[in-house]
């Protein structure tokens, strides 16, 4: 300890404060000194309860300063932050193996995280980009159903593309079978999927991993995961859950929780209904909402984004709940009774793209200005694969509140409140309203288009004089001339796969690679 001429006391630089009561080296307890303790008395650090000094290269080595004001006799302890925001101690697991039945038919031939969004991206790009922007460079993606296009996209977008993973990695882990009876099972749920790869965190390259971030591959949001992890570490929690306040209309679709005034989860229920749902209502002013906002959103919903201490995760999956298959319905509710589960409020846009309706509305919301979510954030971009496509070519067309992706051709058409995906072709006198076109995987040359038309066939894209609204058009679809897609009868559900379309929640979905012939009315 050194006392300078200007009455400044400083502890030696390598010293770090740690809580001996918890044994956690990454948390700090600061001593509080009143005037009487400093003025005219010798400072005795050994008398401070539950605090000891330790020198370690694993700590942020900062100097503790205490200023003595001889006039006012006041003292101040400079608040220190010893916890490093070190993403190298975090590994991320993105769950991408679900069957995606609620998003069918968009998931008929692709995994849910591979579903296109925003005209040029895929859902998997959202958590991947959040990891990159947060500095987390150790990422695993667990896949099972229809994973071919997802694997191809990940290989093109995130391997050897200069995004700076350094000593990190992006690894796709497909569901596999191994010798023995227990090794013949596919993933039975989110927790079981992670359990089957628990050995990854016993590997030598995972020795520095302290926390495991569990993410879903079908959400739309922008989040700094290190803020979340920092809160988790400072709270001392075993598990942390990112949450949002939510209204009555959607509450039963999510895991709901009750928390105490310190943010600790005291009760958790996965997708409750009826009286069980009403029992989960809380006063959400505890989250900082106004009284009016709290009345509109009386529930606290899990985002399905979790942080586990590595040792706790392995203990839960291997020993404490070895037969539990799902995080939301089994692991989290049980853990809330025995472990310290912390709630982290995410106060920004978040959408679960789990149904055709939510997918449709989230896409069209991107056309609004200002939008609740934007892909146009240069500081925290959403990455995707490089396609080297030219700008879109638009001839004598009218565009209203729409997004036109690169490489498209629009001729003498009206596009209103719609998204046009990459490589799209929209013919003369076409009217699109409230429509999401996912685009095409390849171009047809002008000669090929002319030949198809001469033979009475339909090229990729939308033929002239066609009118479409309230519709999702999947990739490589061929919609002919003079077609009307409007669902004028208001049908909510229909399966017409032989005719190239489904209707889900009143939204017409044109199937991938399907053909809608000239003059058809849907």
Swiss-Prot record:
One Pfam short name: LbH_GLGC
Ubl conjugation keyword on record: no
Top-level taxon of origin: Eukaryota
Localization per record: Plastid, Chloroplast
InterPro entries: ADP-Glc_PPase, ADP_Glu_pyroP_CS, NTP_transferase_dom, Nucleotide-diphossugar_trans, Trimer_LpxA-like_sf
Transit peptide segment: 1-54
GO biological process: glycogen biosynthetic process; starch biosynthetic process
Tissue/organ expression: Leaves.
Major site of localization recorded for this protein: plastid
Pathway this chain belongs to: Glycan biosynthesis; starch biosynthesis
Entry's Gene Ontology cellular component terms: chloroplast; chloroplast envelope; chloroplast stroma
Summary of activators and inhibitors of this protein: Activated by 3'phosphoglycerate, inhibited by orthophosphate. Allosteric regulation.
Residue numbers bearing the Phosphoserine modification: 428
EC assignment: 2.7.7.27
Keywords in alphabetical order: Allosteric enzyme, ATP-binding, Chloroplast, Nucleotide-binding, Nucleotidyltransferase, Phosphoprotein, Plastid, Starch biosynthesis, Transferase, Transit peptide
GO MF term list: ATP binding; glucose-1-phosphate adenylyltransferase activity
Catalytic activity field: alpha-D-glucose 1-phosphate + ATP + H(+) = ADP-alpha-D-glucose + diphosphate
Keyword rRNA-binding appears in the UniProt entry: no
Stated family: Belongs to the bacterial/plant glucose-1-phosphate adenylyltransferase family.
Described function: This protein plays a role in synthesis of starch. It catalyzes the synthesis of the activated glycosyl donor, ADP-glucose from Glc-1-P and ATP.
The protein's assembly and partners: Heterotetramer.
Protein's name according to its UniProt entry: Glucose-1-phosphate adenylyltransferase large subunit 1, chloroplastic
Phylogenetic placement of the source organism: Eukaryota, Viridiplantae, Streptophyta, Embryophyta, Tracheophyta
Gene: ADG2
């Amino acid at each position: 300890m050194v006392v300078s001429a200007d009455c400044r006391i400083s502890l030696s630089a390598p010293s770090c404060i740690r809580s001996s009561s918890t044994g956690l080296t990454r948390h700090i307890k600061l001593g509080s000194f009143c005037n009487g303790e400093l003025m005219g008395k010798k400072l005795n650090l050994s008398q401070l309860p539950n605090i000891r000094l330790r020198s370690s290269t694993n700590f942020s080595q900062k100097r503790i300063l205490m200023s003595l004001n001889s006039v006012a006799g006041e003292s101040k302890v400079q608040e220190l932050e010893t916890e490093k925001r070190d993403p190298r101690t975090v590994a991320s697991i993105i769950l991408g193996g679900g069957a995606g039945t609620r998003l069918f038919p968009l998931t008929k031939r692709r995994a849910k995280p591979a579903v296109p969004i925003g005209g040029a991206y895929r859902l998997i790009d959202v958590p991947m980009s959040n990891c990159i922007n947060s500095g987390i460079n150790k990422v695993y993606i667990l896949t099972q159903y229809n994973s071919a296009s997802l694997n191809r996209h990940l290989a093109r977008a995130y391997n050897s593309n200069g995004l700076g993973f350094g000593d990190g990695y992006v690894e796709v882990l497909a569901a596999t079978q191994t010798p023995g009876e227990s090794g013949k099972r596919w993933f039975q749920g989110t927790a079981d999927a992670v359990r089957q790869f628990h050995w990854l965190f016993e590997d030598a390259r995972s020795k520095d991993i302290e926390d495991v971030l569990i993410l879903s591959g079908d959400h739309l949001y922008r989040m700094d995961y290190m803020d979340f992890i920092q809160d988790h570490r400072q709270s001392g929690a075993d598990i942390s859950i990112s949450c949002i306040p939510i209204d009555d209309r959607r509450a039963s679709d999510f895991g709901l929780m009750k928390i105490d005034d310190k943010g600790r989860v005291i009760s958790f229920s996965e997708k409750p209904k009826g009286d069980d749902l009403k029992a989960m209502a809380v006063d959400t002013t505890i989250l900082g909402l106004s009284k009016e906002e709290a009345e509109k959103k009386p529930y606290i919903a899990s985002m399905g984004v979790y942080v586990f201490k590595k040792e706790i995760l392995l203990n839960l999956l291997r020993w404490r709940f070895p037969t539990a298959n799902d995080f939301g319905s089994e692991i989290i509710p049980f853990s809330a009774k025995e472990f310290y589960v912390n709630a982290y409020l995410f106060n920004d846009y978040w959408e679960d793209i789990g149904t055709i309706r939510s997918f449709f509305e989230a896409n069209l919301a991107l056309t609004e200005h200002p939008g609740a979510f934007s892909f146009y954030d240069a500081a925290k971009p959403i990455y995707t694969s490089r396609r080297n496509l030219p700008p879109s070519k638009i001839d004598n067309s009218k565009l209203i509140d729409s997004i036109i992706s690169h490489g498209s051709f629009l001729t003498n058409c009206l596009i209103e409140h719609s998204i046009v995906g990459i490589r799209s072709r929209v013919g003369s006198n076409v009217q699109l309203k409230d429509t999401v076109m996912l685009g095409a995987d390849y171009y047809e040359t002008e000669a090929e288009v002319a030949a198809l038309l001469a033979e009475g066939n339909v090229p990729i894209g939308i033929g002239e004089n066609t009118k479409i609204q309230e519709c999702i058009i999947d990739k490589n679809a061929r919609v002919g001339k003079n077609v009307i897609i409007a669902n004028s009868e208001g049908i909510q559900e229909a399966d017409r796969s032989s005719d190239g379309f489904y209707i889900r929640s009143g939204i017409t979905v044109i199937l991938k690679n399907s053909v809608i012939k000239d003059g058809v009315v849907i």
